Design a protein with these regions (language model features):
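Secretory-pathway ectodomains
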Residues: 1-336
Length: 336
């Protein structure tokens, strides 16, 4: 299905836009625009780049403060195509990808919220109001944060606290509860809480459904959620909460064979692409990518990644598959 065409080292994070890859180098922490063959097309004059984000229109990044090495308040924005400077200023922005809605950044810290237009380099609104927890989800209407075992739902327009809920109330006595992921589905929030899943009304927080099956991650495709818990894999109907384990004991995925050797399918996440669920596995010191049929949970493709590190992420762009591992390697594959 895919063949490897490139392997790059020391890639801590990357963005893929219009056939180009944007990376931060280990040495001097310079931002670079690279072709798919690794040719340098552009690099930033600024060094010691800390956080960055790239979309179709802009490249935005920040540098360490000249006065406090734990503050990143020197912000730069470049036009991505022309490489001209749009904005340069001393403003501390949280430029994590989760806070972007097209070209509007809702920078969210524990002290304030800054709504910033990254095309114009202008502050649209500043709200000096503390918020609680780590942001897990931003929708058109809400910002959802968590501080175990609570979730905090803020109204996005003014960051007023709409509601806080103790998820432990749905799983009394469960000491392993941890809020891992939150998703927006129709007019509900789907909360992955390790010891189970809860579906709550966005409007009033009422319980729609709950499951008591362990869950670590979920990939939503249509009205189904595909859930992984190490060796187990099952499907949940997000409208009803009905679980389907493909008729397997403990919902366990079957072992697989590669070059005559048997492996456990130990992994934690699937990614949906072109009708298949792509599953990263680390077993017996080796990393694999398995393509799973979502209807049968049977394996359609087994590929060994040429690394002894754990595969961390799988993403698809155009006809390419991009894979990263824990040693900061980036593997680029092309569809066959």
């Amino acid at each position: 299905m895919y063949k490897q065409i490139e392997k790059w080292e020391n890639i801590f994070s990357y963005f893929y836009i219009d056939g180009k890859i944007y990376v931060k180098t280990e040495e001097n922490c310079i931002l670079k625009e690279l072709s798919l063959t690794g040719e340098v097309l552009w690099e930033s004059k600024e060094t010691e780049v800390r956080y960055y984000y790239v979309n179709n229109d802009v490249i935005i990044f920040n540098l360490e403060s000249l006065e406090d090495k734990y503050t990143y308040d020197r912000t730069f924005i470049y036009d991505r195509r022309r490489k001209t400077l749009i904005f340069r200023g001393e403003i501390e922005l949280n430029i994590s990808y989760i806070f972007f809605n097209k070209n509007i950044l809702n920078s969210n810290t524990n002290e304030n919220i800054i709504v910033f237009d990254i095309l114009k380099g202008e502050i649209l609104k500043k709200i000096d109001k503390p918020t609680i927890g780590v942001t897990l989800l931003v929708t058109e209407k809400y910002v959802v944060k968590k501080y175990d075992p609570y979730i905090y739902i803020y109204v996005k327009s003014d960051y007023s606290l709409l509601r806080q809920q103790n998820i432990q109330d749905f799983f009394p006595g469960e000491e392993d509860l941890s809020i891992l992921e939150i998703y927006s589905y129709k007019d509900t929030f789907i909360i992955i809480a390790r010891v189970g899943i809860v579906c709550l009304s966005q409007k009033d927080g009422s319980l729609i459904w709950k499951s008591d099956y362990y869950a670590c991650t979920m990939e939503i495709v249509g009205h189904y959620g595909y859930v992984c818990t190490s060796l187990s894999f099952y499907r949940v109907d997000l409208d009803t909460g009905e679980k389907y384990g493909y008729g397997r004991k403990y919902d366990r995925l079957p072992d697989f064979e590669y070059n005559g050797k048997n492996y456990w399918p130990a992994g934690h996440r699937v990614v949906y692409h072109k009708g298949l669920l792509w599953y990263r596995v680390y077993s017996s010191g080796e990393s694999f990518i398995l393509a799973i049929d979502p209807e049968t949970a049977n394996y359609q493709w087994i590929h060994k990644v040429e690394t002894y590190e754990k595969v961390m992420d799988i993403k698809f762009y155009d006809d390419k598959m991009f894979v990263t591992d824990t040693d900061n390697n980036l593997f680029i594959y092309e569809e066959e």
